[in-house]
Amino acid sequence: MRLRMRKDSQQPTLARRACPARTKRKSSEVEECTGESKALLSSIKKFIHGSSIKVEQDNPAKTSHLSCELITSTPQRKNDLQRKSIYRARRRTSINGETTNHDTNKPNGKLEVTEEVVSSPPRTTLLGTIFSPVFNFFSPANKNASNSPDQVVEAEEIVKQLEMEQVEEMPTCTATSREPLSVPLYTSAMTSAFRPPPTAHTPEQESENTPHPDLPPLTAPGSPATGGYVDASITVPAEGSYEEEWEVFDPYFFIKHVPPLTEEQLTRKPALPLKTRSTPEFSLVLDLDETLVHCSLNELDDAALTFPVLFQDVIYQVYVRLRPFFREFLERMSQIYEIILFTASKKVYADKLLNILDPRKQLVRHRLFREHCVCVQGNYIKDLNILGRDLSKTIIIDNSPQAFAYQLSNGIPIESWFMDRNDSELLKLVPFLEKLVELNEDVRPHVRERFRLHDLLPPD
């Protein structure tokens, strides 16, 4: 009985033990089913929304990458914008000068090497831009002025671009020569007899002629030599002879080989209005710089007047010296001549100066500027045909005979003036100019016989 009872007692225990096992199996089966359903649901969610775990892992890395990009790229973009703006400024002013790129640090920390723009011409000074420019003489290798047509076209294109630009151009403040080189030429006091060119100067003689600090480096008012010539103080190089320099810088060599006017230039519309009944019959064309006045951007203690000029968003102060007997000459000549000022300088400067000197236009009736000149291989020549006046009754006075290369018989050369208070060249011309009006004839034979500029032209 006991054994049976034990067995009986053990049977329910086994039964009871078997039930949990069976229950566990059912629970595991339920858990497996629940896990499979959860896995299926999770897969559906992943398919629809994507993996949340991956998003949580990607977001920090992406945020870190963007933060690094924001910190390092901002100055780069700023530098890039600055560099682009500087390059635009350089392109705007590359024709008239070069600009300095102050942004020399690249984003990688290396120094940026400024590259020279090949197509840009060398820098020209402000004086050569708003004042009368220096003439480019023909070189011995290009005597016929036709050996390099590409250079000629390029020079003329550059000049046209200069004229098309507004006043906002290259700012620079260098005091250099504004007029062509002063070389031996006849003055108004010379006799009608032909004088030979001056003899060659030795380096010792040239070293004694030290120009004034205010004068342009290549031009200086010399003292009249024997025969009525004006001997310019030109530094002679260590090697080479004076004859070689004479061949390069002789203005009459320039005049001899200047190309003829084109059909377009010959048919230009006159820049002046028609004469009125009160207009004098004869016209007198006058140059400005070194003929009537001398202007400088350096402060002049003896300046007669000074005025500001706005040029390329920069204000420059111009100091002006008036040639002795400047006003007396104009007042006397304006009574018998139609006075026309014709300068190769920029209008922004010359027009403002004339507004100060002659505000009511009582002395100078008309004003012509650089845009009215003819550009020949980069040089500005004053073609008198643009006046629309009778050339038989027109005279031009200029300190550079190259300026009236196309009407040599109408031109009277005058010594360049800078600061000599004892100068009286303007007064010396008064009797001759008055006589031309009294004769009432073609002025060209008289001017030609008096100054004999054609005799200074080199032989064929």
UniProtKB/Swiss-Prot annotation:
Its EC number is 3.1.3.-. Gene3D superfamilies: HAD superfamily/HAD-like. SMART domains: CPDc. CDD domains: HAD_FCP1-like. Keywords: Hydrolase, Protein phosphatase. GO terms for molecular function: phosphoprotein phosphatase activity. It comes from the Eukaryota. Residues 1-31, 191-231 are annotated as: Disordered. Signal peptide: none annotated. It holds the Pfam family NIF. Residues 277-436 form the FCP1 homology domain. SUPFAM superfamilies: HAD-like. Disulfide bonds: none annotated. The keyword NAD does not apply. Belongs to the CTDSPL2 family. Probable phosphatase. This is CTD small phosphatase-like protein 2-B. The gene is ctdspl2b.
